């Protein structure tokens, strides 16, 4: 009888813990952030009842990276700030809590990496913002490929092909899209939303169907962090601007022409970034 009582108490305790954990999960989800209001303003919220100061920083403010706005603490322990109405666009932001910067919004599942910084993001819908969002249009494909360079190393690239490429036989122009300092072959796809933008522009007839090649221009590493034998190295602003990537470029173009149905002429190639 004693064993049965102990077992019943144990089961009851487990049930309480599971129920409590479930309640805590739902309580966290009660914090809505970011909330896009009808007038285009955005309300940010962060549950941090023990914090002394919380600010929000992002590219919706004029001086990106340095400008921040103080958030107000509510009695519930939630900190809150509402912006002015924002133009239609994609915006990145993060919180600063008691001096700890680069805190992603735990209520926002949408996160991108810019070099070594993780940032939350949101999209204000409208003429410009809609290009960043996936729409009900024909979608292209993105492949990650490895190409052998003159130095014997294989380097990783991301390549976008437009809708219909796999089923067709036609040849396409090529855009070589270069990332900025500290970036890699994933930068334009994640932070830049390249695939969504291309799908939408092509669907509207504003862009010719094309192949887009996104190279990894960091000569010290062969891929974005975590995608090669080099392991989970921490991304950083590389100072290895020795000009060797420029020497690799003809090899990259040749590899793309050999492996994809391209219009292999200079007038059908473009480079940007």
Report each predicted region and the residues it spans.
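Non-catalytic, glycine-rich low-complexity segments
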Residues: 22-47, 123-136
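Cap/lid segment of the alpha/beta-hydrolase catalytic domain
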Residues: 140, 152-153, 178-265
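Hydrophobic h-region of N-terminal signal peptides that target proteins for export
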Residues: 11-20
């Amino acid at each position: 009888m004693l064993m049965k009582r102990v077992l019943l108490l144990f089961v009851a305790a487990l049930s309480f813990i599971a129920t409590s954990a479930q309640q805590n999960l739902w309580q966290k989800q009660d914090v809505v952030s970011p909330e896009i209001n009808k007038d285009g303003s955005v309300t940010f919220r962060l549950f941090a009842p023990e914090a002394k100061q919380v600010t929000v920083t992002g590219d919706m403010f004029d001086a990106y990276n340095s400008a921040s706005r103080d958030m107000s603490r509510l009695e519930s322990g939630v900190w809150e700030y509402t912006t002015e109405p924002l133009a239609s666009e994609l915006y990145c932001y993060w919180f600063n809590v008691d001096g700890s910067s680069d805190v992603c919004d735990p209520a926002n599942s949408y996160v991108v990496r810019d070099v070594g910084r993780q940032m939350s993001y949101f999209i204000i819908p409208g003429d410009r913002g809609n290009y960043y969002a996936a729409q009900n249009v024909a979608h292209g494909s993105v492949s990650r490929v490895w190409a052998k360079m003159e130095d014997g190393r294989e380097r990783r690239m991301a390549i976008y092909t437009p809708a219909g490429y796999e089923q067709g036989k036609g040849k396409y122009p090529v855009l070589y899209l270069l990332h900025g300092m500290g970036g890699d072959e994933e930068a334009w796809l994640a932070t830049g939303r390249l695939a969504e933008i291309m799908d939408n522009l092509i669907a509207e007839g504003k862009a010719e169907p094309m192949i887009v090649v996104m190279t990894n221009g960091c000569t010290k590493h062969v891929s974005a962090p975590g995608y090669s034998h080099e392991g989970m190295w921490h991304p950083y602003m590389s100072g290895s601007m020795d000009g060797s990537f420029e020497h690799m470029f003809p090899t990259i173009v040749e590899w793309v022409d050999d492996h994809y149905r391209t219009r292999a002429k200079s007038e059908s190639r473009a480079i940007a970034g």
